[in-house]
Amino acid sequence: MVEKSLMNNIMKRIIYTILTMVVLGTMMYSCKKDGYFVGGDLHNPKINLTTYDWLKSNKDGVFDTVIMLIDKAGVKDKINKQGITFFAPTDYDIYNYVQARSIAMQRIDPEKKWTVDSMIKYELPRFADSIDMYIVNQTLPNDLLTENGTKYKNAKGKDVVVSYEPTDDPNLGYNEASSVRPRIVYFSYLFQALGNNVPASDIVLPVGIRTRVQTSNAQTTTGVVHVLNNSHILFFYR
């Protein structure tokens, strides 16, 4: 079953993450603002692969279920469209979604459960449409982003805010011994109108949801990819 495979893969990745956290903690302080992190290593942001192929080639398989749903929904061309930015969810974000859906259903019927198989059976049209939430029809590398954030239209025509904010959080790479203050990309999805002078850091519900990017500035042959963190819930489900 797809659901069992997803659970097994996620558990393996959780164990891997725990084992590598200490190493990552000592490596992250050297992050440069124009780089991006994959597994704690600095890489040149230029990637000689399409967005789809880069996600599919991830050595830890953190996009396996995402890629499967993209294939089944027939939206490969959407994320490979030339000149876009894709804020990519991970398999963890899909897991968070099916868990949240299950909890909501079980308030009515404790025996009900929502799974990845349920998504394949019932939600591929929704997935095909909602993937547009994560696409901005222009390239947004880190050097074009601002601390207070800028509003853009996503591919569904809805407002999103993308910002590039400094952090003093040691868990996000800050080290008081370093002269370089790390910066983090945030992707904020808006449910309500936002004034032009409101900084992205002030966005809260019910106005919108801020989602931190865990891997930023990946510049593929077709566009830019910013990978959302593993606590995100697919479709901004709430």
Residue ranges of model-derived segments:
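Sec-dependent bacterial lipoprotein signal peptides
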Residues: M1-C31
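Mature, structured domains of secreted/extracytosolic soluble proteins
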Residues: Y16, Y29-R238
